[in-house]
Regions:
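Juxta-kinase regulatory segment immediately upstream of eukaryotic protein kinase catalytic domains
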Residues: 2-33
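ATP-binding pocket architecture of kinase catalytic cores
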Residues: 36-143
Length: 143
């Protein structure tokens, strides 16, 4: 199951955006990341499209609202950004956030950019893909 949802793929046509527009915005806002040369879509996830951005050998993550008409409080990437940013100076491990854009004219919807953190995503809620000892350690840390 994990291979079906893990990794990246080419960006789906209905979720694509203009990379030149994003780079122009990054430069204009003086966001502390390099120009983006490659964009892939993460395979997993349920609601907000998530992309792997690469620029100058560095990886970043862009999360955005999906295109189309949405309920006002749905897909609140601004809330995600604010929560992750608020956790920066706490013991909770979180990626560094770089920028929140609430102007849908840039790439079609609101979005934010954060640090890419390599790790393991357990798609199965009981983490059946790991051995019993490791699973116990994971569950102990969650409690």
């Amino acid at each position: 199951m994990s291979n079906q949802f893990s990794g990246t793929k080419e960006v789906a046509e209905n979720l694509a955006f203009n990379l030149d527009d994003l780079n122009k915005y990054i430069q204009e806002k003086e966001i502390n990341i390099p120009s983006i040369s490659e964009c892939k879509q993460f395979k997993g996830g349920q609601s907000n499209p998530t992309y792997l951005l690469t620029g100058n050998g560095q990886n970043y993550v862009l999360r955005r609202k999906p295109p189309g008409k949405l309920l006002k409080s749905a897909h609140a990437v601004d809330r995600e950004y604010r929560v992750i940013t608020a956790l920066q100076d706490t013991p909770v491990p979180t990626p560094k956030t770089y920028h929140l854009c609430e102007d849908p004219e840039i790439i079609g919807t609101d979005f934010y950019i954060m640090e890419f953190c390599d790790g393991i995503i357990y798609w199965d809620p009981v983490a059946s893909e790991v051995n019993t000892e490791r699973r116990k350690g994971i569950f102990d840390q969650l409690n």
